[in-house]
A protein has these predicted regions:
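Hydrophobic beta-strand positions that form the internal "hydrophobic ladder"
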Residues: 52-55, 105-106, 149, 253, ...
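Serine-hydrolase catalytic core recognition
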Residues: 404-730
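Residue-level detector of Asp-centered blade-edge/turn motifs that repeat once per structural unit
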Residues: 50-51, 100-101, 144-145, 248-249, ...
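Hydrophobic core register within WD40 beta-propeller blades
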Residues: 46, 96, 142-143, 244, ...
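A flexible loop/linker signature enriched in serine peptidases of the S9 family
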Residues: 59-72, 87-93, 108-119, 135-140, ...
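Short loop/turn segments that connect beta-strands within beta-propeller blades
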Residues: 77-81, 123-126, 225-229, 297-301, ...
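Bacterial N-terminal signal peptides
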Residues: 10-20
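Mature N-terminal segment immediately following signal peptide/propeptide cleavage
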Residues: 26-61, 66-67
Length: 730
């Protein structure tokens, strides 16, 4: 399939798509409608060319009539010329990456008859065919000036070592192979048969169990030149090699592996064994040396241990002179990650961010020997430079926004990144190395931004239980008039170890456009404030975090422009748990909407694909700590609920399974509490983020209608057509 036929055509198409807003007539900004969601364009994955003259990036749009998202790779010049589409609109393409000499652009694409997902375009011959690299991913490590990539990949199943777990670990809860039941007639059995603990996944659905001895597929290192169509295996052995990084001269590979280079099957069985034991704080909370950093010649040989360090290492990066390695290290699950540097010859790792509490990401060595990285600092996201002497990092790109995904050219003079704020969807920006001379390179959303009055939010902080500072925001409704009172909806994020932030968010804009204030906070348990803050809710979900949310509600309810009799609450996942918890503890809210809810923790443990969450958060399995699981389950207090509730659930959600919502809905109906229950097909836990566009927008519309009725007295309009059989209202 040919790409866009010529550079001239590319520029013309790009001009029509990107600069059309320049010729649009001025309009009076209006409120967001549901159809506007389909028009938002997202920019991501920037990659600066080695010469620093171009930036490749991924553009994601929504094809409304096809009910799908669409991704393409575009390229912009640093001097501000119109961006050009570089991949065919007939295929899905993303994750661009330049070859070290800048002559090729690699990207991921799903195409018919393809034997893999990696394709490459010759930059010096634009408009030609994309060539496939059937075995190479776009995520490998490439040496400076090199013409090859190295990556970690699981061995083929037919060459993987056999894991004989049943002879060595008879306590594993799986019957012997010769004891497994078989269908009486395979042609008449279309059910599912499971014998493994991992039998379903939110991403993959139901996972079939193997009926034979399991082969253990360890991750080996592979190499492929850009001009080749086949890969070469560089490592052997029965342990996995992770986070590979090739030295600048292409002669050495650094990687992370088990601290004792034990076989993966042994490590896995040890963890299985520990996982079956009752929770023990001394054993389970003690820092362990689970992995270490090794270096080996790219030609092969015995790995040499570079660092023996407590905790886990990742994101290895060589310094430009090849003498040092930087990595992100986390001493233990509930400890903050730090950036460390260690000589390749060995020695003690040096912490280059000191006691800085925030989490680093995307580390890169600069040409001057410093390390650049991105980080969430509360609700902001900034790009920073580490102080190599261990002082506080210095912000290079900051402000009230989210600036992420920094990419630089070979000499470190040009930086590209994506940026979004409360009132601006994501666009591509570039700057000089020091963050100066910032320019916006893309304007995909300019026409929409001029047409729609996106609502901004006022940031505030407050002191909660234990004098802990909490960050929050209050978004004003569309058409705000001084002296008028408005309803407010409290939003509660999932996780709980995630966050709300300073970026554009469709859900907040959706309700603000309906004429409501939107209150959102990052209560204790949120990420972005350090590990101590994040894990302060262990064993205490619904306690001080609930107080944090109610304290914010108290503050906002005292405002003259808030109607404290017309307050609502909404949340999903952890927020779904918290909204049902709130409903059992207070009647201050006039209406509540709960997504992906959790109402009974013992049920959740058995029905979820993520049991490890509560094993850690609640200090063991239900039978280890049944009293805590029961005490924190909203269903135990459902008789207290009086607030009307809308329940939204996805049919294929294997993270927070359907039963939690069914239990709650049935209970509310028996109690006589007004309740609605909406179930979405073909959707998993991520419906509100990556679900089918039509269903995602339908959900946004139902939130408007639900809170519109209970908080504003707006009656729901009659449907345009009768629902088809099998759907609609029952």
């Amino acid at each position: 399939m040919s790409l866009v036929s010529s550079p001239v055509t590319r520029v013309l198409l790009a001009s029509l798509c990107v600069t059309g807003a320049l010729h649009a007539q001025p309009v009076t900004p209006r409120a967001m409608t549901l159809r506007d969601w389909y028009r938002v364009t997202t920019v991501s994955q920037p990659a600066v060319s080695p010469s620093g003259t171009h930036v490749a990036f991924t553009v994601t749009t929504v094809r409304e009539t096809e009910n799908k998202r669409h991704q393409e790779v575009w390229v912009a010049t640093i001097d501000g010329g119109a961006p050009q589409r570089w991949t065919s609109p007939g295929y899905e393409s993303s994750a661009p990456r330049w070859s070290p000499d800048g002559t090729h652009l690699l990207f991921t694409s799903t195409r018919p008859q393809g034997k893999g997902n990696t394709w490459v375009i010759r930059v010096d011959a634009p408009g030609g065919e994309a060539m496939q690299l059937p075995t190479m991913p776009t995520t490998g490590s490439v040496p400076t000036g090199g013409a090859f990539a190295v990556w970690a990949e699981q061995t083929p199943i037919d060459t993987a070592p056999l894991r004989d777990a049943f002879a060595r670990m008879p306590a594993l809860a799986r019957p012997p192979f010769d004891a497994l039941t078989m269908p009486a007639d395979p042609t008449r059995f279309d059910g599912r048969h499971f014998v493994d603990i991992s039998f379903k996944s939110n991403d993959r659905g139901f996972v079939a169990s193997r009926r034979t001895a399991r082969n253990w597929r360890v991750a080996q290192l592979w190499k492929q030149s850009f001009g080749d169509t086949s890969k070469v295996q560089l490592t052997r052995g029965n342990y996995s090699h992770r986070s590979p990084s090739v030295s600048p001269d292409g002669q050495w590979i650094a990687f992370v592996a088990d601290a004792r280079l034990r076989a993966d099957s042994v490590v896995d069985m040890e963890r299985d064994s520990l996982g079956r034991l009752p929770y023990d704080r001394t054993r389970d909370e003690t820092e362990r040396n689970e992995s270490d950093i090794y270096v080996m010649p790219i030609s092969g040989g015995t790995p040499r241990k570079v660092a023996e360090w407590m905790g886990a290492e990742s994101d290895l990066e060589w310094s430009a002179n090849g003498t040092s390695l930087a990595f992100i290290g986390r001493p233990a699950r509930a400890k903050s990650a730090r950036i460390y540097v260690i000589p390749v010859t060995g020695g003690a790792p040096k912490n280059v961010v000191g006691a800085w509490q925030y989490e680093p990401d995307a580390i890169t060595w600069m040409s001057n020997g410093t390390i650049r990285f991105s980080s969430s600092i509360g609700g902001r996201a900034a790009i920073l430079d580490a102080d190599m002497n261990g002082g506080a990092p210095k912000e290079v790109v900051g402000g009230r926004r989210r600036a992420t995904s920094p990419s630089m050219n070979t000499t470190g003079t040009v930086m590209a990144y994506v940026s979004t704020s409360m009132t601006k969807p994501t666009e591509l920006f570039v700057s000089d190395a020091d963050g100066g001379n910032e320019r916006q390179l893309t304007h995909f959303n300019d026409a929409l931004n001029a047409e729609v009055a996106w609502s901004d939010a006022e940031r505030f902080t407050y002191r909660s239980v234990g004098n802990l500072e909490i960050e929050g925001w209050l978004m004003k409704p569309y058409g705000y008039v001084t002296g008028k009172k408005y309803p407010v909806v409290l939003y509660i994020h999932g996780g709980p170890h995630s966050q709300y932030n300073e970026g554009w968010f469709d859900e907040f804009q959706n309700l603000a456009a309906q004429g409501m204030f939107v209150l959102f906070t990052n209560p204790r348990g949120s990420s972005g404030y350090g590990a101590d803050f994040t894990y302060s809710t262990r064993g205490r979900w619904g306690m001080e975090d609930y107080d944090d949310l109610m304290k914010a509600t108290d503050i906002i309810a005292r405002r003259a422009d808030i109607d404290s009799t017309k307050m609502g609450a909404s949340g999903g996942s952890y927020g779904g748990f918290m909204t049902t918890w709130i409903a059992t503890k207070t009647q201050r809210f006039a209406a509540i909407q709960t997504d992906r809810t959790i109402t009974d923790w013992t049920y959740w443990y058995g029905a979820s694909d993520a049991q490890g969450l509560t094993e850690y958060e609640f200090f063991g399995k239900p039978w280890d700590n049944q009293a805590l699981y029961d005490r924190l389950s909203p269903i135990r207090y459902v008789r207290n609920v009086r607030t009307p509730m809308l329940l939204v659930q996805s049919e294929d959600d294997f993270r927070t399974a359907m039963g939690s919502a069914e239990i709650w809905y049935t209970s509310l109906k028996k109690l006589g509490v007004p309740a609605e229950f909406v179930r979405y097909p073909r959707s998993n836990h991520d419906l509100s983020r990556t679900g089918e566009p039509w269903l995602l927008v339908d959900r946004l519309g139902r939130l408007r209608q639900w809170f519109g009725y209970w908080l504003q007295g707006t009656k729901t309009a009659a449907p345009a057509a009768t629902a088809a059989a099998g759907g609609g209202t029952h």
